[in-house]
């Protein structure tokens, strides 16, 4: 039997739909406390966009460099997990992840709408990011209807700019 003692990368989405801090719960259990009696039934819709320093128009090639401007979106149902700031240098030697953008809403449609707005408000200058990819994905009709599969991205067209595209500034 295998035991995974780590929390999964996508735990943020689970936390948002059940409205509970899984990291806090995991620490309590490790300290010998009993698992909480919270109702863990999903009550919301949530999705996460991993914002990486990558060039989506060049096969997602990493784009190390210095972030010259960083402004994350805010608002009800919008969460940004990051360690990055203006002046931060994205190294070519490590993971290119800049932030996890998580949005939560009552319905999938509302969640997509909120994610579009949050992506439009997210400002990262100095390196190319995956923000244009996520904007384009939010505009895709198949994605909006939940009609996608594991091979979906192989046929996804990134050549055209997304409707809500804001030009990225790379110096």
Language model: regions and residue ranges:
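ATP-dependent carboxylate activation and anion-phosphoryl transfer catalytic cores
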Residues: 1-171
């Amino acid at each position: 039997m295998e035991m995974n003692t780590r929390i999964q990368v996508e735990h943020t989405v689970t936390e948002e739909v059940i409205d509970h801090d899984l990291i806090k719960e995991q620490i309590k259990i490790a300290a010998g406390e009993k698992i909480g009696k919270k109702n863990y039934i999903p009550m919301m819709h949530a999705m996460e966009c991993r914002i990486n320093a990558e060039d989506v128009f060049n096969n997602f090639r990493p784009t190390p460099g210095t972030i010259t401007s960083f402004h994350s979106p805010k608002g009800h149902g919008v969460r940004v997990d990051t360690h990055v700031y203006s002046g931060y240098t994205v190294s070519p030697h490590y993971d290119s992840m800049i932030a996890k953008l998580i949005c939560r809403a009552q319905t999938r449609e509302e969640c997509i709408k909120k994610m579009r707005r949050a992506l439009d408000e997210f400002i990262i200058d100095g390196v190319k990011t995956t923000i244009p990819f996520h904007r384009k994905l939010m505009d895709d009709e198949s994605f909006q209807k939940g009609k996608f599969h594991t091979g979906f991205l192989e046929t996804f067209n990134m050549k055209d700019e997304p409707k809500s595209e804001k030009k990225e500034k790379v110096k």
